[in-house]
């Protein structure tokens, strides 16, 4: 363990990661146009409310905006995302799917959160993580890959589950990233894991292939708190871990954490 720090917005990250946010919105039932009951104000990030419109007007989300020189990983846990981009691509994904996009020389894309259910709420839970590109690949052509939930590896043990969005965990290897990604080189040992623990259960994070050179972050997103080794970490905090040593994560109440390393 290196340090435990308070979470901000966006989450603090370590190289090669540039940015991380966790969206948790309790959207109500939508109307016949998949809209929310209220209109957005153009920049709705009010965390005191049950849900946010972000930059959307009637459908919440993040309309068209430019990216260049890095990658975005949109890891969905619950809810739907509508993707459109300047390459002419578009589609809907969610409920455990991962979109991994290489912005490269530049792309404009939008991610909206349609309220697809008219007869029940539309909860949304997802992470968006930005991963730097190697210098030699900064200006490659933009591209993306879709990893569908049913194909994403999951490790199950008694009272614990790990979704392997990237990297390797206990013999399970994540699906292939885009070819120009920092994560495409196994020597970089990039990993993104989503971990769910029942109350009182634990799991041990392995040593990185990079040893002390790797930088590993652990974000607590749900639950009152966890023990990281011998130290307690409450909700609203994250840990910078030593990657050259194993780390036992134990939940007091049921908890969910995300780990990013590289």
Name each model-derived stretch.
Residues 1-262:
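Jelly-roll (double-stranded beta-helix
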């Amino acid at each position: 363990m290196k340090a435990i720090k308070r979470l901000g917005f966006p989450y603090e990250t370590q190289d090669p990661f540039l940015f991380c946010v966790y969206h948790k919105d309790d959207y109500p039932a939508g109307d016949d146009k998949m809209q929310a009951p209220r209109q957005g104000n153009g920049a709705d990030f009010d965390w005191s409310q049950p849900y946010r419109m972000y930059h959307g007007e009637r459908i919440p989300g993040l309309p068209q905006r430019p990216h260049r020189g890095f990658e975005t990983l949109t890891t969905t846990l619950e809810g739907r995302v509508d993707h459109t981009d300047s390459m002419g691509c578009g589609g809907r994904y969610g409920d455990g799917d991962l979109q991994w996009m290489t912005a490269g020389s530049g792309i404009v894309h939008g991610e909206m959160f349609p309220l697809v259910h008219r007869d029940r709420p539309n909860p949304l839970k997802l992470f968006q993580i930005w991963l730097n590109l190697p210098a030699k690949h900064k200006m490659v052509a933009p591209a993306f890959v879709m990893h569908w939930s049913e194909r994403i590896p999951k490790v199950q043990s008694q009272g614990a589950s790990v979704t392997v969005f990237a990297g390797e965990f206990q013999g399970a290897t994540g699906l292939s990233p885009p070819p120009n990604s920092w994560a495409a080189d196994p020597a970089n040992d990039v990993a993104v894991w989503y971990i769910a623990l029942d109350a009182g259960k634990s799991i041990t994070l392995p040593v990185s292939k990079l040893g002390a050179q790797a930088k590993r972050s652990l974000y607590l997103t749900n639950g009152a708190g966890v023990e990281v080794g011998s130290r307690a970490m409450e909700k609203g905090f994250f840990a910078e871990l030593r990657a050259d040593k194993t780390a036992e994560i134990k939940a007091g109440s049921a908890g969910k954490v995300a780990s990013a390393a590289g």
